[in-house]
Amino acid sequence: MNKTIVKLIERACRKGVAKAYSYSDYYGNPEHVEKYRVVVEGTEGDIWHLYHYGTLTATVSFGVETVEYGESRSDVDSIQTFIEELTGFTPELHYYPSKDLFTVVKNGKVVKQF
């Protein structure tokens, strides 16, 4: 469970948007980078979006989850936590670094690959 995502969901419930930043420093140039963002849309808060470094990775719309993109183990962790917190269902996601392959599995069958 990714505590950062849980905290962002709680904040987004109150504010509509919640962001978490990371701080990267290379060659003496500090840079403030948005790591995660959770956005709530709709009058009843029906549509939720999860962004990781500016890329849309998952959406929950009216209780139906959609995995949009993934390419790392941190994407697997954040997407699983995001969907589990909002729907109560934990999706089966896998990242294989040796193959550079991200898969979404439902009912034992691969439904998406990135």
Task: Name the predicted role of every residue range.
Residues 1-114:
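Terminal leader/tail segments of proteins
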